[in-house]
Every structure is written in C-alpha cells, then in structure tokens.
Amino acid sequence: MLSKLDQNGHISTIPRLDRDHPMFYWIFKNMDFTQWSSAKCSRVLWLSGPLECNIPQVSSYIVSQEKNAALNTEHLVLYFFCSAATKTRSVAANFTHTLLNQIVCSSPMDKRILIIRRFLYSLIEGISNKETSLSREERVLNEKGLPDISIQSIILNAPPKELFTALEAVLGDEEQRCLSVIIDGLDKVSYQQSEFIREVRAFVEYLQQRTSKIKILLTSRPLAEIKDLFDGLPCIEHDRERKGPSVS
C-alpha cells in the first residue's frame, strides 16, 4: 500500500567514491563538513554544486558511513535520493513512505505494527480534519488496524503537509534515538518542487527541536529558488566554500 522506493537499489547504481580524489576536496577538506561529520551536537549542512561535482557519490558514501557507524546501536539513519523519484508525481508520498519503511525496518519486530499504526492514525486524522466530507465509516480502521479499501487511495494521494506531519508523529515517538538524515538531489524533483522543498525545510526545523543528536545533510544544484527556500541553513557551495588549513 505504501509507495516506498528502493533506495538501496538506487544507491547500487551510483559509482563508488574515491574520497581522496581532488574533485571532492571542496567537501571533504572543508572545515564546515569536518565540523558536521565529527559533531557531538546536532548539525545541519546543505551541499550545493553543479552536476559535474558528482554530489550523489558523496551522499551515497555518507549514507554508507553513517549506516556502518550505526551498527549495533539505536542510531537511526534515514536517506532519500530524489533522483529515484523523477518518474513519479507523488514525491512527498514517496519520501515519507520510504523513510517510514526505513524506520520500521530498523525497529524491533514487536514495535513495527505500532509504528505503522501511528503513521496511519496521524495521517487519517489530519486528512479527516481537512476533508470534512469524509464519512464516519471512512475514518474507521478495520479490525486488523489497517485502513479500509475506501480510504487507501486517500492515504496514497494525501497532501504533502499531512504526510510530513504523520512522519513527524512517528519520529516523535523515537525521540531518544540519535538520528542521521540524508536527502540528496532536491533539484531533481520535477513536480511541485517548491512545495516539496518547503515541506523539507519545515521538516528540518522540526527535527532541530529534538533533544537527541541529529545530523542532517541536504544536497542540490545551486538553483536560485532552492537558495531562497534554504536561506539561513549552513551551506557549502562549490567554489564559494570556506577552506580549512589543509586546502591550498
């Protein structure tokens, strides 16, 4: 029922990165990236560069590093490559459903159905409050705790705001877990890009209120409309970055 995307399959198509290659010095030898990578407190970073910078390779590498560091811990690693969703109009649904699936898969078996129910209850409540035309029967879950067929299409086509709110409700129950979030290629979103990125910005601001440690990495090309929406976020932009002492 959920429109999740195979992120690991997509990552497997991205060429592996040579961290020591000079073309990536602007990131890996940058003081802002070093602070983000090694931070003991919450950090947000936006990487911005043209296509030839091969930023998806960097994102793929960081996802792998974060997942390896999270082994045998409660640390939660969530990631989404927008380029995997270029053929669909429902990127907000793809995004929230994919991250929900990652949360479920990283949780104990006895908690998984509770997480899914939490997401669905929050989503249905949000839609019900917005769509007053829904009948009482349409708002009721069946005996298995899953939506009736009559509301499944509503869930799959829910507005972005309600989808993000439902995802936040799930993460609110995971408050004590440290969290890494990597969202790559926001410029690749072709349908309702501004609306989606605006929701991502609000999502980032929500996560920054968490008491546990968070690391958030966002990437895109340096497009003017994205710059406007991400104004104020810490950023490394290609050829405009601050350089550490190890970079000439």
Model-found features: residue ranges?
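Conserved NB-ARC/NACHT P-loop NTPase core of NLR-like innate immune receptors
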Residues: 1-248
